[in-house]
Amino acid sequence: LLFNRVIYNNYSYLLVLKGSDIESDLVTNILKEYKIPYKFRLKTTRRSFQEATYEITLKSISTDRLIKSFYTIEGIEEVHIVSYNGEISG
């Protein structure tokens, strides 16, 4: 199974970050650094777990490089970038 590591042409994605402590300011700083348009969508918290979801628009960027940037934030344990068509159900 092969995955393309470069995303192209203004597609919408969901950026899902999971971990013990997610600093929203640090996340938005990275998005601004890469000049990625974003909308905050959801934050779920439990005692020792947080999940934050952002809708992002990517042109042509190495997802590996972007993902590594989020892992520099202490407390982030998982980073997911998911294709998104604008609909959320469930």
Feature annotation, model-predicted:
Residues 1-45:
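Canonical alpha-helical transmembrane segment with a positive-inside/aromatic-interface signature
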Residues 20-21, 56-63:
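Helix N-cap motif at beta-to-alpha junctions
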Residues 26-34, 62-75:
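Short amphipathic alpha-helices in soluble, non-transmembrane regions
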Residues 38-44, 72-88:
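Conserved short beta-strand edge segments in small beta-sheet-based binding/regulatory domains
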Residues 50-55:
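Short, hydrophobic beta-strand segments
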Residues 60-66, 85-88:
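A general structural signal for short secondary-structure boundary/capping elements
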